[in-house]
Amino acid sequence: MIYFFGDVHGHFDHVLEIVARDRPAAIVLLGDLQAQRPLEAELEFILEMTEIWFIHGNHDTDSDADYDHLFGSALADRNLHGRVAVVDGVRIAGLGGVFRGQVWTPPVDWLYESAKEFTARCGRGNRWRDGLPRKHRSSI
């Protein structure tokens, strides 16, 4: 059995309680995790009880800490974004982040042909860790 939990926004107590009680084969955290510390630390109590997977949400790039606690965690390889994984015998596909209409249907003609071109033209002061601005790390 797979359990899905969405929009926990840093509150994992109910996830820990339900997993400890029901022992599902796997869980998938559906966006807006906003872990207050590395994800493996938040979920330490259940690491040996279940497989843990996640799909990031728009709020998971709100701050450096939100980003690092998820994408820099020991569970970063459990990110389902942009891929299909077999979880407890079921294929699950992930598309995380936020759909930004301005990216897909801008009010003017396209300004950039690629993320690389956008990054080059956005100016060093607008870059995050010498790449895309942090908020666009979750843009679809």
Over which residues does each language-model region extend?
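Active-site-proximal beta-strand elements of phosphoester/diester hydrolases
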Residues: 1-9, 89-98
